[in-house]
Amino acid sequence: MWLLPLVLTSLASSATWAGQPASPPVVDTAQGRVLGKYVSLEGLAQPVAVFLGVPFAKPPLGSLRFAPPQPAEPWSFVKNTTSYPPMCCQDPVVEQMTSDLFTNGKERLTLEFSEDCLYLNIYTPADLTKRGRLPVMVWIHGGGLVLGGAPMYDGVVLAAHENVVVVAIQYRLGIWGFFSTGDEHSRGNWGHLDQVAALHWVQENIANFGGDPGSVTIFGESAGGESVSVLVLSPLAKNLFHRAISESGVALTVALVRKDMKAAAKQIAVLAGCKTTTSAVFVHCLRQKSEDELLDLTLKMKFLTLDFHGDQRESHPFLPTVVDGVLLPKMPEEILAEKDFNTVPYIVGINKQEFGWLLPTMMGFPLSEGKLDQKTATSLLWKSYPIANIPEELTPVATDKYLGGTDDPVKKKDLFLDLMGDVVFGVPSVTVARQHRDAGAPTYMYEFQYRPSFSSDKKPKTVIGDHGDEIFSVFGFPLLKGDAPEEEVSLSKTVMKFWANFARSGNPNGEGLPHWPMYDQEEGYLQIGVNTQAAKRLKGEEVAFWNDLLSKEAAKKPPKIKHAEL
């Protein structure tokens, strides 16, 4: 375990502490009793009971490293669940950066990181003396499957304002969560199996917290949105949830889902000094490594950073979801085409400028000069192969389509970032929404178009709807900020209402809200921003262009299959 002071939101600290019951909440779970705390928000009579760090699985240590999660051990005392759990192991420096961006904290908390991290946080506005049945919203955080944690997302405001039970879960990340040898010795997808285990825990226990196990909505952003999308496709998650929301990430996001990751496993073996005579030997070697040794290995892998100098086909900036035959039986494209998945009501959305600032900055795109010529853009698109998956021979055609209409190098840079946003998020999201709709499930789409007042000073003022920007609205941060503009407070209330209405009924619409059309053959969607309004055919032309380009390419040549043996 290691410590790092992180600037995090302790949203509860902004709350006033009036009107809560005299004694703190104690709730029974299948494993034992847990003690929480009450948090009251100004202007709202009903306090929220908060339980932080409730274990939903056994610590994944020793022989449970690279293994499916096991049920938590029971305890006979009252467990104190009033402080944040450790976050799963990850690069602490990069996590510091992202936490600073995604939380509005004034208070510096010392956060722990540990391999023992399978905990969840519960925020319930229910009167625990009565048997309430409130809708449950289970949040899966983002971070490229290598970063993040539940403490960054305080569910108090959403729970209090919308009368829903919010659960923020954690799951193993990086090597701990997604290391795969492609065989039975380490299938991978451990982090997703943790998510499934958390959903089982919710089914078994959430009624005691005033939640309805028959009304569970899973929602997540970025890799959390991709996780939601994977769970929609997974037979293991059947009947564990009833509605789903993917914000800026789906199972067709190329960087996050691969058939196998044997090539990355090979790289890990070399860096770890492990023999790979057999998978069993390799996995045994990695299980012997200490937590710190695996962290050191994580730093050497340089996750989330694109290599703009080496061979991008040999670079592994992500340890993604893999086809393991269990959680994910086939590639998402096949499962979607066969219409064989959990056809629950589904909201799929993207932000207006997914590659506006945060992602190119984190991934190390050389754009500091703020301008770009066509040749460099074409080269950058090819260097982005691990996340864009565009064959080298198509890169000039693509950059010409997007950048060819202007000679202004500043505009070219902006258009290149639009191209990246479309390839990585826009096109996959629309494709998933269409397939979901065609399988007969109620589907809704949105595009978020607002620049939060929380935005980093470093982010150019022109960037509106950057990756992650909707999170502030979804969790009601502006309602606690005090000095947030009125339009932002109003927008946040609208977004929370849409999300919670959807959690209640599978339809986001309700009294006093702009109409959000269902995503049908006309492809109506909602533009969410200062002027929230319906529009049609989100990214329609762009999707047509990319589908046409990639299908022509696929028809031209037989697929090359490259095997990396372990």
Swiss-Prot record:
Functional note: Involved in the detoxification of xenobiotics and in the activation of ester and amide prodrugs. Active towards triacylglycerides containing short-chain fatty acids from C2 to C6, and 1(3)-monoacylglycerols containing fatty acids from C2 to C12. Inactive on long-chain triacylglycerols and diacylglycerol. Hydrolyzes aromatic and alkyl esters and vitamin A acetate. The hydrolysis rate depends upon the amino acid promoiety and the esterification site of the prodrug.
Enzyme class: hydrolase
PANTHER family referenced in this protein's UniProt entry, alphabetically: CARBOXYLESTERASE
Reaction(s) catalysed (UniProt annotation): a carboxylic ester + H2O = an alcohol + a carboxylate + H(+)
pH-dependence annotation: Optimum pH is 8.0 with tributylglycerol as substrate, and 8.2 with retinyl palmitate as substrate. Active from pH 4.5-9.5 with retinyl palmitate as substrate.
Key words of the record: Disulfide bond, Endoplasmic reticulum, Glycoprotein, Hydrolase, Phosphoprotein, Serine esterase, Signal
UniProt protein name: Liver carboxylesterase
Subcellular location as annotated: Endoplasmic reticulum lumen
Organism: Sus scrofa (Pig)
Carbohydrate attachment residues: 80
GO biological process, one term: lipid catabolic process
Gene Ontology, cellular component aspect: endoplasmic reticulum; endoplasmic reticulum lumen; lipid droplet
Similarity comment: family membership: Belongs to the type-B carboxylesterase/lipase family.
Sites bearing Phosphoserine, chain numbering: 379
Regulation: Activated by CHAPS at concentrations of up to 130 mM, higher concentrations reduce activity. In the presence of CHAPS, activity is stimulated by non-ionic detergents. Inhibited by the esterase inhibitors diisopropylfluorophosphate and phenylmethylsulfonyl fluoride.
Signal peptide stretch: 1-18
Enzyme Commission numbers on file: 3.1.1.1
One of the Pfam families matching this protein, by short name: COesterase
